[in-house]
């Protein structure tokens, strides 16, 4: 992860993580 922009990167990573979790739940 790039620490130059922790705010933007963190929000983006968390958003992708939430999407991945939702996809995993749907697959299950």
UniProtKB/Swiss-Prot annotation:
Record organism: Archaeoglobus fulgidus (strain ATCC 49558 / DSM 4304 / JCM 9628 / NBRC 100126 / VC-16)
Full protein name: Uncharacterized protein AF_0073
């Amino acid at each position: 992860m790039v620490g130059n922009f922790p705010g933007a990167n963190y929000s983006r990573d968390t958003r992708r993580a939430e999407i991945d979790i939702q996809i995993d739940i749907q697959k299950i």
